[in-house]
Amino acid sequence: MPKTYEYLSPEQVAHFLEHGYIIIKGAFSEEKAAQWTANLWVRLGMDPGDKTTWTRERVHMPVHKRELVETFAPKAWAAIKDLLGGEERIDEHASTWGDSFIVNLGTDELEKATEFVHPRDMDNWHVDGDFFIHYLDSPEQALLVVPIFSNIAHNGGATYISPDGLELIARYLAEHPEGVTPVDLTLIPSTTPHTSNPEQDPGFWSHLKEIKRCSKFVELTGEVGDVVLMHPLMLHTASKNYLRVPRVITNPPVGLKQPFNFNREDEGEYSLVERKTLRALGVDRLEFRPTTERRRIVPERVKIQERMKQEEETRLRNLN
């Protein structure tokens, strides 16, 4: 008997297993989005009506407030539970979303452009999770999530993904049970002796190099309230905003209480993410065991966003 899900339709399940992502349309309301973005421009220190004040092309903003996903976007929360095998597997600390907006404003030069960069040649390809050592079964980043807070049209700075890149990353991580460290747009084996020249390690991985092997690319255009849910190993990149219509998204992580399990006794207990990983590897099951201790990293962005938060709080106080 086919497994039943709280929210996902058979078509959505099939799409996720084939392509590694699904889009939940209208997962939260325009009113909710408007409430959360009401002070966006004050926080940025920019004027929405004066592009000369848009001095940064892309801004990763700090978080000021959070809300349970269950109340903010009930449909997305139901889909997240379906993808990860049930609410009991999800880390309760990863069940909130915040207002840490990622804003893509473009530039004057891009607005005048007549030629556009091919997705394969974009310069920001990566997998998420700059705060931990990566293993195939890492629980810290169990899904890649993109809630959309502004309408995003073609060439308007949408996130691009590469569904066939997921297979490359999965196989790479399966071959590196020692874990790999995310550094800029690369992955470096955690036990490498080549600390000063990591690119000399046979296990060195460059996202910008490996993306050249990919042929499938999807531009995540959408409308306010849409939420894209992706496999955690989905290669993705920011794109250029040629339209200069402000693009606003967030990128909240979802964590698990325990690592993914690719060798369950009952095959019916595999989550959809686990099933997609196994499919990417071309196997029915896999006994994966990390050979080094799991550990977290404090990324440089944390310090940067703390400074940004203090600056934003000052602007908000001055507004009042």
What do the PLM-derived regions correspond to, one by one?
Residues 46, 174-188, 210, 223-320:
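Non-heme Fe(II)/2-oxoglutarate
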Residues 8-11, 16-19, 28-224, 237-246, ...:
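Non-heme Fe(II) oxygenase catalytic core, chiefly the N-lobe of the double-stranded beta-helix
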Residues 21-23:
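Generic N-terminal leader segments that precede the first folded domain
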Residues 1-3:
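Eukaryotic N-terminal targeting leaders
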Residues 25-26, 125, 230-232:
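Short His-Asn-centered micro-motif
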